[in-house]
Amino acid sequence: MNAPAIPSPVAQFRAEYRTAEISPYYSGILHFLFTSVTSLVVIGFSIKELHGITPFEWSTVLLTFLYANLVEYLGHKGPMHHPVRLLRTLFVRHTLQHHRFFTHEAMAYEGTQDYKMVLFPPVMILFFVGLHAVPVGVLLYYLTSRNVAYLFVATAIGYFLTYEWLHFMYHLRADSLPGRFPFMKTLRRLHTEHHDPALMSNYNFNITFPICDYLFGTRYKT
């Protein structure tokens, strides 16, 4: 299957962005591997530390998953699409760059250098682990139990990695292997609709699972 033609404004923005923002030394594959391996190491270490988990402690997984889905939704609907003081970098990278690099008419990468426009910068995972997952985990360790703390960290980082992997796959070509699975077709369609400039500020803010979009009535109905 031939890739659809890229609209000229998108092609022009991509060329300008690559020249200005992507170093010739950048490796999209190494970027993807860093995100994946770092996340998996943290998840693996956290799981290794679990012992004798009670039913109450297992509830941490569900609660953390729902919490992460809400944070994903609010972060995307809020500062990623509306400029907020001190968080303007998120708005610039997401709305002014990501949504111009990829539109509903041109969703796919043209090469591995384009991974930079989808994956969070490597420093983000260090920020997320060091300034969110670990501090909250330490707090839970002292307020609840060791298992709750490690279950929170494993689930939170697992959710982050799921976000990165799914978002990465949405921007593969439609005829790629992941894109052929029915559930991926549905999630990809929702994200493609979100990349329509006429819809992006109002619909389909969940990148992973559209739980909050259903709850808050922001899932786009075709």
What does each model-found stretch correspond to?
Residues 43-59, 138-151:
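Helix-coil boundary and interhelical linker segments in multi-pass alpha-helical membrane proteins
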Residues 34-38, 61, 65, 156, ...:
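Hydrophobic alpha-helical transmembrane segments of polytopic
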Residues 59-75:
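N-terminal signal-anchor transmembrane alpha helix
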Residues 18-28, 32, 51-54, 146, ...:
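Membrane-water interface of alpha-helical transmembrane segments
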Residues 19, 52, 57-60, 64, ...:
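Generic hydrophobic alpha-helical membrane-segment signal
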